[in-house]
A protein has these predicted regions:
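A short, histidine- and acid-enriched strand-loop-helix "catalytic/donor-clamping" loop
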Residues: 15, 65-84, 96-99
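Donor nucleotide-sugar binding/catalytic pocket of nucleotide-sugar-dependent glycosyltransferases
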Residues: 66-69, 91-137, 211-212
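A short helix/loop element that forms part of the nucleotide-sugar donor recognition site in Leloir-type
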Residues: 134-148
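Conserved donor-binding/catalytic core segment of Leloir-type glycosyltransferases
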Residues: 148-164, 170-173, 185
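Nucleotide-activated donor-binding/catalytic signature segment of Leloir-type glycosyltransferases, i.e.
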Residues: 197-215
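Short alpha-helical donor nucleotide-sugar binding micro-motif in glycosyltransferases
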Residues: 214-215, 222-227
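Short hydrophobic beta-strand element within catalytic cores of glycosyltransferases
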Residues: 254-257
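Conserved acidic donor-binding segment of nucleotide-sugar-dependent glycosyltransferases
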Residues: 269-270, 274-281, 289-296
Length: 354
């Protein structure tokens, strides 16, 4: 641990109410015991709504300990009445912290505007980022997945859950003018999967959409590489970053995302991706259809946008940018090369913390 001593107290997931109660008791007792009988400089608490009371107890016992919290979901942006119950406790705990880690500039704004946290107490760290040794464009991905290499592929990767926007995606697909010209893939599982299957039947898309269960990271990279247009239709306010959008960008997808929440932290509309109105399947459909007439000829347009996606999602990691330039150099016109050079200058000044 690079010279640091780290002890971990973790709350294990339980399904039953009794199991959850026992899990919390065990978690609290272990955490308090560790802090009482060891000298720690820092207490790092992940998901503040579950740890707020514990932080208060430990700060009472050990006033000198510095507290770092990581907020990243409905712990600070409630989605329902159950989440709302924890917000007063969270608000009363925040004055005790020394540093708040957030995954995006969107969540930085939430913590400043809704919780009154000072900017100097907030640090942006994008959820560990992306493993670019895994998430990169894979050649012949469509063939490897037994998809038609001559058809554009439109995809959704994510869970079938409330507010994830899978039904918005299906509405957009149902409105495609010539849906048979495309191939549609959906990857994921979730409690609303049967509802998704019913909606697919209602829209008569059974022979159009190919569904796959959730995949490993390496397998996901293959799907992203096969997808030309990746749709990220979330309308969850608590989607703090949305790693799927960044993973898709790293693999060369054109990303069309809801203009809200986490994706607004890294997508620049019409530069490295596109926005549509949240919960608006018609607008998403129009963005998909409009893609046919965008910037340069079709091949060069795709290369241009792959560059944007790789450059921004790699956060200027040179080896990935150079690999892209070597791979596509011969296929780019002089004008495209000039525009990419200008875009590199613009990207290099892109402030990830604002």
């Amino acid at each position: 641990n690079n010279g640091y001593q780290v002890d971990v107290s973790a709350l294990k997931k339980k399904d039953s109410k009794l199991g959850k109660l026992g899990g919390y008791l065990s978690f609290y007792i272990k955490s308090i015991f560790l802090c009482l009988f060891h000298h720690y400089d820092y207490l790092y608490a992940h998901y503040i709504s579950h740890c707020a009371l514990l932080i208060k107890i430990i700060k009472k016992l050990k006033p000198s300990i510095k507290v770092i919290v990581n907020v990243h979901g409905n712990d600070v942006v409630p989605e329902d009445a159950h989440d709302e119950k924890f917000i007063p406790l969270v608000k009363s705990t925040l004055p005790l912290i020394d540093l708040c880690i957030v995954p995006s500039s969107y969540y930085q704004k939430v913590m400043m505007e809704q919780y009154g946290l000072n900017e100097d107490k907030i640090k942006i760290f994008p959820s560990g980022g992306i493993n670019f040794d895994v998430f990169q464009e894979i050649e012949n991905a469509k063939e490897k997945l037994h998809l038609d290499p001559n058809k554009k592929c439109i995809g959704y990767i994510g869970r079938y859950e409330k507010r994830k926007g899978w039904e918005v995606f299906l509405e957009a697909i149902s409105l495609l003018e010539n849906v048979e010209q495309y191939q549609i893939v959906m990857v994921g599982v979730g409690e609303d999967e049967e509802k998704a299957n019913a909606l697919i039947q209602e829209y008569h898309l059974e022979n159009v959409i190919k569904k796959y269960p959730m995949q490993t990271q390496k397998e996901l990279a293959l799907f992203y590489s096969a997808i030309d247009i990746f749709c990220f239709p979330t309308y969850r306010k608590s989607d703090s970053l949305g790693l799927v959008g960044l993973e898709a960008m790293a693999c060369g997808c054109i990303v069309i995302a809801s203009n809200m929440a986490g994706p607004t932290s890294y997508i620049k509309d019409q530069e490295n991706g596109f926005f549509f109105k949240p919960r608006d399947g018609k607008d998403l459909n129009q963005k998909i259809e409009d893609d046919k007439t965008m910037y340069y000829n079709e091949t060069e347009s795709l290369i241009w946008r792959i560059f944007n996606c790789v450059y921004f999602s790699a956060r200027q990691e040179e080896k990935y940018v150079k690999n892209f330039e070597i791979k596509y150099k011969k296929q780019l016109s002089k004008q495209a090369k000039k525009d990419i050079a200008i875009n590199k200058m613009n990207a290099s000044s892109f402030n990830w913390e604002k």
